[in-house]
Amino acid sequence: VAHDRKFKNVQPKDXXKVPAIAVANPKEEVIVKNKDEKMADLRNVPKXDVIXK
């Protein structure tokens, strides 16, 4: 698989199959799943707070 080189420390047998995006950026996955709702929330929250979460 192409992204195996990117995540060398992630083994397929660990915790079953984990989506690459979840490994790379868990917060980003949440935004993608609930895009409209999360993007609306992000507009009302200072960027510093979003990064800190």
Swiss-Prot record:
Protein's UniProt keywords contain Thylakoid: no
Alphabetical UniProt keywords: Developmental protein, Membrane
Tissue expression as described in the entry: Mainly expressed in the fetal brain where it is specifically localized to the proximal axonal segments, cell bodies and growth cones. Lower level of expression was also detected in the fetal heart and the skeletal muscle. No expression in kidney, liver, lung or spleen.
One GO cellular component term: membrane
Localisation: Membrane
General function of this protein: Neuronal antigen that may play a role in brain development. May be involved in neurite formation or axonal guidance.
Name the UniProt record assigns to this protein: Neuronal protein NP-190
Native organism: Sus scrofa
